[in-house]
Amino acid sequence: MPSKTASKAADTASRGNTGNFVDDYLADWDDDPFRSVSPEPAKNDKDGEKKKDILGIDKELDLKKKPRAPRVKLDETRLLSDKGIPKLRKMAPRLKLKGKGHEFSDAARLLSFYQEWLDDLFPKATFLDALAMVEKTGHKTTMRSARQKWIDELKPRAAIEEDEEDNRIHRGAVGPQQPPKVASIFETTAKAAGERAKTPTTDDLFGDDLYNATPVRNTGSTAPPQQAGGDVPDDDDLDALMAEAEAEARAQTQRPGPAPSSGSIFGNGARAVAPTTTAGPDDDDLDALMAEAEAQSLPTRAAQPVVNGSIFGNGAKKQTTQVTGDEDDDLDALMAEAEAEAEAGVQKTAQPVDPKEVGSGNARAAEKTSNLDNDDDDLDALMAEAEAEAGVGAAGGSSGDKKTSAQTETGHRTDNFDDDEKAMDEMDGLW
């Protein structure tokens, strides 16, 4: 145990060393206030750094987006790729179906075939989803055109196309084909068609009158020649008309002349040449007028049992009646006048036509035609009156004395028979 004196000695020694401690403590102090402070050494305190970064305030932010991986889609581009429908077409020959009686197994085999193809084409989707995507993509225009192209490739080639190809090859071997020869008339027609008038463009439409927009017909070859002096024809037309009139006159002079008159309005039984001009009535018109007069007189004489259908008789024996002398004279005068008019018309038609009178002949012909029509009307009226008087005389004679009728029949039978025979011969020549 240490004594008290020893402890006191230790304290005294420690007090003596106190001055050294102060000196040592103040040794680092510098009284220069302008001295630079030396930097403190950096502290590598990792634990402190971790504590400060807990909230992430001092950490730098990265605002750039990271590139995403490309999203694979089942679109028309993927279907038309090598793994798409082209691969399906190559795999199709390997699919074998058994047919009738194996429908279930064939359907399962077909579904597995498509599932294998879709798993390789688009493995991301299930089989049902992939089928729906393929169906939706198949309605696009690109897929439709591609499908139609594949269908056309499978169709057999038409015989016409093969013939055309053979002909093309043959033409290439023989040489260039020459164009077919065309007649000159068709070339002229084609040129005329190309020179037809065309509708003017919009620039010319409003530059001139609005009515000039209508195409004008090409009158170079189809329009008739225009007359220089209004209604007066030019020299070429007049020469053509004169030449035509001369040709007609020459043809009429070469024809055989009319036969001599036989003393009857019906002629001599031969068919007369029809006149070409309308200067006088021809035989056909006169025959038509006579037939019309007879047809008009038939209804009035239908109730009379003895009267014939015509004033000239029908060639059969009939019971005649006595007619007064005045009626016979009127009838003879009427027939003579008709014959004279017929002969005058024939003579006028036989005369040649003067070419200089072509222009004024139409007016005179129209005037003569109107006069002849009036004469024909008068002739029809006179003949109808004569037939009516003859019918009345026949009715009166039939109701007279039987002896008078017998005498009349025996006295005039011979003459009437001859007249009837002559009339029948003339009618045979006409009709």
Swiss-Prot record:
Origin species: Chaetomium globosum (strain ATCC 6205 / CBS 148.51 / DSM 1962 / NBRC 6347 / NRRL 1970)
Underlying gene: CSM3
Signal sequence annotation: none
Family in the record: Belongs to the CSM3 family.
Cellular component terms per the entry's GO annotation: replication fork protection complex
Primary location: nucleus
Function: Forms a fork protection complex (FPC) with TOF1 and which is required for chromosome segregation during meiosis and DNA damage repair. FPC coordinates leading and lagging strand synthesis and moves with the replication fork. FPC stabilizes replication forks in a configuration that is recognized by replication checkpoint sensors.
Keywords carried by this UniProt record: Cell cycle, DNA damage, DNA repair, DNA replication inhibitor, Meiosis, Nucleus
Assembly and oligomerization: Component of the fork protection complex (FPC) consisting of TOF1 and CSM3.
Ranges annotated as biased composition (Acidic residues): 325-342, 417-431
GO biological process: DNA repair; DNA replication checkpoint signaling; meiotic cell cycle; replication fork arrest; replication fork processing
Keyword Chloroplast: no
Chain intervals for the UniProt region annotation (Disordered): 1-20, 32-51, 191-431
Comp. bias regions, Polar residues: 215-225, 251-265
Protein name (record): Chromosome segregation in meiosis protein 3
Bias kind Low complexity: ranges: 1-14, 381-392
Biased composition (Basic and acidic residues): 42-51, 400-416
